Every structure is written in C-alpha cells, then in structure tokens.
Design a protein with these regions (language model features):
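Sec-dependent signal peptide recognition
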Residues: 2-10
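C-terminal motif of bacterial Sec signal peptides marking the signal peptidase cleavage site
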Residues: 16-19
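Bacterial signal peptide processing site
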Residues: 21-23
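Short, non-transmembrane alpha-helical segments in secretory-pathway proteins
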Residues: 28-52
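Exposed beta-strand-loop-beta-strand "reactive/processing" segments of non-cytosolic proteins
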Residues: 56-75, 80-81
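A short, polar/charged loop-to-alpha-helix boundary motif
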Residues: 79-83, 101-103
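C-terminal partner/receptor-binding element of secreted or periplasmic proteins
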Residues: 95-125
Length: 125
C-alpha cells in the first residue's frame, strides 16, 4: 500500500513539473495553429529578453488586403514592427527617433481593421 501511494505521489509530481513554466503563447480561443510559426518565433525571442515596458504584445489586423501582425514599440526610441504572415517586415508604423516610424505605411493606424490581440507578455517586470 505504501509503495502504491509513493508511486502515485511521484507520478503526480512528474506531471506537475513537466507542465511548470510552460505557457500557451496564444491567449486567443483559436489556438497556436492560428499564429504563423515565424510570429511564434518572434514571441519566443521576446520571452528570452527582459520584460518590456510597456509589456510586449502581438496583434493581428487586416491592412491593405492582407493579414498582418503588429508588434508595438517597446519604448521611446524603438520602432514598432508590422509583418506579413511570412514575417516579411512591411514597415515601422511608429516609434524610432522621430516617433513616426519609417514612414513606409503612414496610413496603418487609420486604415487597419479587425484588431485581435494574440499574445501579451504577462511576466512581472
């Protein structure tokens, strides 16, 4: 009986430790399969860094007839980034030294539609 209880406790501890620290990157009900792998890789990159201020987020929008992924600027002089589904950089809509991004898509904030927050870094800074 004692051996059975010990085995049960060890099994429970094993399962718990295997799940500890794992995070479902996507906070949306659609799941991870709705986020392109290259965007998932960018999220993984961000998670390896210090917590941003403000915390990092990834949004999905429709812009100029395509699905795009927006990572807002992390602070002051850092530009935001707007990517295609293949992680090709479209532009930096804002941020950077001028605060205006790279001026390659000045219409982004006025014409984007279908905003969906896909991920937000919930780590404590």
């Amino acid at each position: 009986m004692n051996a059975s209880i010990n085995a049960l406790i060890l099994s429970a501890l094993f399962v718990f430790t295997q799940q500890c620290g794992k995070e479902n990157i996507s906070k949306n009900p659609e799941g991870l399969d709705q986020i392109p792998e290259c965007i998932q890789a960018k999220i993984a990159e961000i998670r390896q860094q210090e917590v941003w201020n403000p915390p990092a987020k990834v949004y999905r929008y429709q812009f100029r007839g395509q699905t795009v992924y927006f990572i807002p600027q992390r602070c002051c002089d850092f530009p935001s980034q707007l990517f295609t589904e293949n992680c090709e950089l479209i532009c930096a809509p804002d941020g950077g030294f001028s605060g205006s991004g790279d001026n390659a898509c000045p219409d982004f904030f006025n014409t984007r539609t279908d905003e969906k927050l896909l991920w937000e870094d919930k780590r404590e800074g």
